[in-house]
Amino acid sequence: MKGLFKNKSRLPGEIVRQTRDLIALAESEEEETDARNSKRLGICAELCRNIRDLKSILYGNGEAEPVPEACLLLTQEFFRADTLRPLIKSIPKLDLEARKDATQIVANLQKQQVEFRLVASEYLESNLDVIDSLVEGIDHDHELALHYTGMLKECVRHQVVAKYILESKNLEKFFDYVQLPYFDVATDASKIFRELLTRHKSTVAEYLAKNYEWFFAEYNTKLLEKGSYFTKRQASKLLGDVLMDRSNSGVMVKYVSSLDNLRIMMNLLREPTKNIQLEAFHIFKLFVANENKPEDIVAILVANRTKILRLFADLKPEKEDVGFETDKALVMNEIATLSLLDIKTADR
């Protein structure tokens, strides 16, 4: 085989099988209390070398690009004999470089095709407990958590995986994960959370329609009301993107018809940081643009008209944004001309 295997004696399938055997051997040696430490170290060293070789096949190295035929053989063997599960399970026992390599292998395999099929998606659909392991892994210490988020970011690109997480208890964990004290882990968790709520539009729309009350109660309370600056900013931006997506139009109308939701946005508009104010504005304008505003929403907008107009007069992004200025002018004009008489119109 050309490229990577010009001077290699082992074929991809053989390396995969040896890797799987070494993982099993490392586990059995760990269970033997009288096993010699040097023997365990030798097994782990060989395992790390194999993992490095697998990564080189998928990504290439300084001497050669990846060989499609080699990637195909590796992918086929990897999923044929369920190597993904033990590799993920072995990550805590690997050294740092091998952990990085294993993470990259799992991520890369999500994109590999066999006869135009994403075999990783098919595999995960039948082995969803692997996703449970990745989600639970984020609860590990800082260094390990980054490897699990790195793998999961690629897995949630599969619609079947995103749907499973949305409809399982796993989703609830992300309301905490996005607020973890380690910034890099929280950032990764936020990216996964965004993928779950934006990539697969039909799945998201169906989920939000069925779980509206629970989801937005959690979202409002944990992320928009009690979250840190980082959490509030990310959550308000994501919420705006979700509500303004056409596939979520029914959810958007329901959200902007709630007085409680309006109050949350008005509180965010009073945040001392302009970035949060700007994100909140993009959601607030949906309440104002609603042609069928409920009576209580019209009343609170009229009652707070002066404060809102004064706040918006000074609200500007750092860089000139014609679109923002146009939206702001429309919102301010609507609020300025709003009257309690409009309640009757809204009720028709």
Swiss-Prot record:
Give the organism the record lists.
Answer: Arabidopsis thaliana (Mouse-ear cress)
Q: Which Gene3D superfamilies match?
A: Leucine-rich Repeat Variant
Question: Which PANTHER family has this protein been placed in?
Answer: CALCIUM-BINDING PROTEIN 39-RELATED (PTHR10182), GENOME ASSEMBLY, CHROMOSOME: A09 (PTHR10182:SF20)
Family, according to the entry, reads as follows: Belongs to the Mo25 family.
Pfam families attached here? Mo25
Name used for this protein in its record: MO25-like protein At2g03410
